[in-house]
Design a protein with these regions (language model features):
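Catalytic core of DAGKc-family lipid kinases
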Residues: 1-101, 105
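Short acidic/glycine-rich loop or secondary-structure boundary segments that cap or lie
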Residues: 53-56, 97-99, 111-114, 138-142
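Gly/Ser/Thr-rich active-site loops/lids in small-molecule metabolic enzymes
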Residues: 65-70, 119-140
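A generic structural signal for short beta-strands and their flanking turns/coil linkers
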Residues: 83-85, 99-101, 124-129, 173
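Short, glycine-/Ser/Thr-/acidic-enriched flexible segments
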Residues: 94, 110, 182
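Glycine-rich phosphate/pyrophosphate-binding beta-alpha loops
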Residues: 49, 104-119, 191
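ATP/nucleoside-binding phosphotransfer catalytic cores, i.e., glycine-rich phosphate-binding loops
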Residues: 91, 122, 134-212
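Short glycine/serine/threonine-biased micro-segments
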Residues: 2-4, 12, 47-49, 110, ...
Length: 212
């Protein structure tokens, strides 16, 4: 029953926000398998992130008021004083080093509140969608993020393109991220304890979810 702040998983699966309509799925819904993924010893069914979005999630969790307005306010405030973090990314026999505003690892095309950063992500395709927003000036940053939200296209991860593209969007079944500056981490929108290395891997057909 979608009763959270963003309800990203429910939106991705087409589950109604109305509680009574969502309850109808117990009798009329389809129990379909969806993927999940591991982040070291933790579990995620939707997405996790390092850097900017995780910083906002940590601040949001301790804020006196909740809701979309508070989240937007915190996002805007942090956008105008961005921190770029050093990361190493290993996937598909490729290794890159970069300075990035954030990295999102998505199993769902929903971040919450109908906002997406990985528009090609699917709950049941056996793949993780990884978005790396590399260091750039604020004007380019805003334009590139809006372009990614509207029409992000999946790239092939390579050493030639890894830190050259301002936004890198690729898919993988597993990856490892080194995080030497301990950029903050969120898992499914909730603040989580970060680590200097994160091993991330898809779990195909992890559980069944009642959906329309």
């Amino acid at each position: 029953i979608p009763m959270g702040s963003g309800n990203g998983l429910a939106l991705a699966a087409g589950i109604p926000r109305n509680a009574s309509k969502a309850l109808d799925l117990i009798f009329k819904g389809n129990a379909a398998y969806i993927d999940s993924f591991r982040i070291n010893s933790a579990f995620s069914c939707m997405l996790c992130g390092l850097g900017f979005d995780a910083l906002v999630a940590h601040e949001f969790a301790t804020h006196a008021s909740r809701g979309l307005a508070t989240y937007v306010k915190l996002t805007i405030r942090n956008f105008f004083k961005p921190t770029f973090y050093p990361f190493g990314i290993e996937a598909d026999n490729t290794s890159i080093q970069t300075n990035a505003l954030f990295i999102s690892i998505a199993n769902s095309n929903q971040f919450g509140n109908n906002f997406t950063i990985a528009p090609k992500a699917s709950l049941n395709d056996g793949l993780l969608d990884i978005v790396v927003v590399n260091k750039m000036n604020k004007l380019s940053l805003l334009y590139k993020i809006l372009k990614q939200i509207r029409a992000g296209e999946v790239n092939i991860l390579s050493e030639e393109t890894g830190d050259k593209k301002r936004i890198l969007y690729f898919q993988a079944k597993k990856l490892a991220i080194t995080n030497p500056s301990q950029a903050p981490l969120h898992i499914d929108g909730e603040p989580a304890k970060t680590a200097t290395r994160l091993n991330i891997e898809i779990i195909e057909n992890a559980f069944r979810l009642l959906q329309p």
